[in-house]
Curated annotation (Swiss-Prot):
Residues 147-175 are annotated as: Disordered. It is a multi-pass membrane protein. The chain crosses the membrane at residues 26-46, 87-107, 121-141, 205-225, 227-247, 289-309, 359-379, 393-413, 429-449, 462-482. InterPro entries: PIG-M. Belongs to the PIGM family. Keywords: Cell wall biogenesis/degradation, Endoplasmic reticulum, Glycosyltransferase, GPI-anchor biosynthesis, Membrane, Transferase, Transmembrane, Transmembrane helix. It comes from the Eukaryota. This is GPI mannosyltransferase 1. One of its GO terms (cellular component) is glycosylphosphatidylinositol-mannosyltransferase I complex. Pathway: Glycolipid biosynthesis; glycosylphosphatidylinositol-anchor biosynthesis. The lineage of its organism: Eukaryota, Fungi, Dikarya, Ascomycota, Pezizomycotina.
Length: 487
């Protein structure tokens, strides 16, 4: 009888070996991400100096102008269209510094350019910190138990036979560090993320704040989580949508590490919590109250300080402006055309005929219902990171103003969802989703290019239909995310 020798193992391909080296240790990945941003920063300087189409984002010029006003002891809101917290202008004060007279002309020019680019370097560095936090959360696992919970596990096991306590809540298995870095690379090596930050968009700072907030919540550092939540909402309004999900997630069983009642919500549980008072008492736990107090105190303290310094312009430009905002430029939203028509009617000649009902004033209702009520109640207790992703995705998709910078709000959360997602288990589905998402933007950008650079009126039907197409694609992706999180 003939015997067959075992098949020789296939040699690793060069590409798989390269990826293995990249993710096996942190240094190669983070150095690669760092070099990517350095290359883009240098290229941006060249393009700004040699091309009529500038690399630097117009928002960065607004930031640095506001910082210049602050350096002269004036309000950052003296710069028209500055709609951000003064803290951002304070952070960018080094962009106003210049070289001294002791430097020669060439050296002074280099130093001045370097100082002016300080904000871009800061935002790019924030990308790297956000990527590191993504890795930490993935290694931690989505239900990382607190030290108190670990201590209670022994007590739970001892009293388990009495039936008074159920099984302990164990942590979901954290990811292997090398695999976690592979998913963090989706953010760190993403050319879209790196380009937006090196052009001078501050969204990378939000990425750090959001990931730090999630890390603090999952590791049960409630006071720190409250401070980060309050600061994040002050810095940029949208993180307030995370508060309902975090509060709903923070039940006694999850924070203590022990599930009440062996049946996990059987008839006895319902009887003990039947009254409204008992239900309210169970909901208003000390950790929830601590989170609410620290986040609200942080938010109000910062706003009080800024109001004392800069008065009503701070409230108007940082918060109130966004309720009635009608910015239609570079806007992927289906509301784009309506906002354009509304902006055209805001003139003295049209003021008498201007309708009292404005769709842009009510456009926030669908996004708030989805992102602060329906999605948190559905997903938060099952998978908090996926809930935050779905909430952010819904908020951006249904927002009346949707720009490329806003995509970073949910891209930073994407690596936390992908490992268990349908888009990852079915590579074909993932590629289709990515292709449609990119194609939707490309079609819109083609129509916008004809409008802005060729002077052709493409609002109807081209630009509007492209916006609707991109909206439909995003709604489908959102449906898949919610379905995955609800499993």
């Amino acid at each position: 009888m003939a015997t067959t020798s075992p098949a020789a193992p296939r040699p690793k391909s060069k590409s798989s070996s390269l990826l293995s080296t990249l993710f096996s240790r942190p240094l190669p990945l983070y150095v690669s991400a760092f070099l990517l941003r350095i290359v883009l920063l240098l290229y941006g300087l060249w393009q700004d100096a040699n091309s009529p189409l500038k690399y630097t984002d117009i928002d960065y010029l607004v930031f640095t102008d506001a910082a210049r006003f602050v350096s002269r002891g004036e309000s950052p809101y003296a710069r028209e269209t500055y709609r951000y917290t003064p803290i951002l202008a304070w952070l960018l004060l080094p962009t106003t510094w210049t070289a001294g007279a002791q430097w020669g002309p060439w050296a002074a020019k280099v130093i001045n350019v370097a100082w002016f680019s300080f904000g871009k370097v800061l935002f790019a560095a924030a990308d790297l910190v956000a990527g590191w936090l993504i890795e930490q959360v993935l290694v931690m696992g989505k239900d990382f138990p607190s030290s108190a919970a670990k201590g209670k596990e022994k007590d739970t096991e001892k009293t388990k036979e009495g039936g008074k306590k159920g099984p302990s809540v164990t942590a979901s298995t954290g990811m292997d560090p090398s695999r976690a870095r592979a998913f963090a690379a989706i953010w760190l090596l993403n050319p879209m993320v790196a380009t937006i930050s090196t052009r001078g968009s501050s969204e990378g700072l939000l990425g750090v704040l959001v990931m730090a907030l999630l890390w603090a919540v999952l590791s049960r550092r409630i006071t720190l989580a409250g401070l980060l939540l309050g600061f994040s909402v002050h810095f940029k309004i949208y993180p307030f949508i995370y508060a309902p999900a975090i509060v709903w997630w923070m039940d006694q069983e999850r924070l203590s590490g022990v599930r009440a009642g062996g049946g996990g919500g059987g008839g006895g549980q319902k009887k003990t919590s039947s009254s409204f008072r008992k239900t309210l008492t169970r909901f208003l736990t000390l950790p929830r109250l601590l989170l609410a107090f620290t986040s609200l105190a942080t938010f109000l303290s910062l706003n009080f300080l800024m109001y004392r310094l800069y008065g009503h312009p701070f409230l108007q430009e940082t918060y109130l402006h966004h309720v009635t905002r009608i910015d239609h430029r570079h806007n992927f939203s289906p509301y784009n055309t309506q906002l354009y028509l509304s902006s055209a009617s805001v003139s003295p000649s049209h003021s008498a005929a201007e309708p009292k009902f404005k769709i842009e004033s009510l456009a926030f209702l669908p996004q708030l219902v989805l992102s602060t009520i329906l999605i948190p109640l559905t997903l938060a207790k099952k998978d908090l990171p996926t809930s935050l992703l779905a909430q952010t995705f819904a908020f951006v998709t249904f927002n009346k103003v949707c720009t490329s910078q806003y995509f970073l709000w949910y891209l930073v959360l994407l690596p936390l969802y992908l490992p268990r997602s349908s888009f990852w288990t079915s590579k074909r589905m993932g590629l289709v989703a990515l292709g449609l998402w990119v194609l939707g933007q490309a079609l819109w950008l083609q129509q916008a290019y004809e409008l802005e650079f060729l002077g052709r009126s493409t609002f109807l039907p081209g630009l509007w239909m492209a916006s609707l197409g991109f909206f439909v694609v995003n709604c489908w992706i959102l449906g898949v995310i919610v379905g995955d999180g609800g499993r």
